[in-house]
Amino acid sequence: FIGVIGVAVGEISNQNNEKLLSGSKIFYGDTIVVKPKSNAQILFLDETVMTVGESTELTIDDFIYDPKTNDGNFVTNIKSGIVKTISGKISEKNPENLEIKIPNGSLGVRGTEFLVSLNNKKESTVLLLGPGPENTLGMVPGNIKLTDGINTTVITSPGFQAMIQNVVSLAS
């Protein structure tokens, strides 16, 4: 397994329509489906934390992690809904090894906390929550590179966001 459901409120299931509860294991290739009026928190082995809002579907396309070296690769495909992520050890060591796919683009995440909100697969909003380049906690500053296949936007300041609409579908 690559992670566990830390918190499950309401109806959460996997691609086989098996109910997921707190403590349920998450595996490579799993699709997590969170129904309306439900939410979940997923804790991954590299200490990445995803808080998954209602009416959300995401798939773990790739997760390879070596806890001895913190090397790995993590690719998630968010198909609908809203997901808040705090990146873990994979992104901390190799920021280019964490990728978030969305219906109309993809994100390259560089060690940070961020929110992705999808509106009916037609509009994606990405918000950088932090830490920024001038944080007082001594944390490595993060940034997000958002691309729609044609244009690329880099968000480096917490509280800033970018949006893409109906451009190119990179995620299937």
Task: Write out the residue ranges for each language-model feature.
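Flexible, surface-exposed loop/linker segments and immediately adjacent secondary-structure boundaries
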Residues: F1-T31, K35, F44-V168
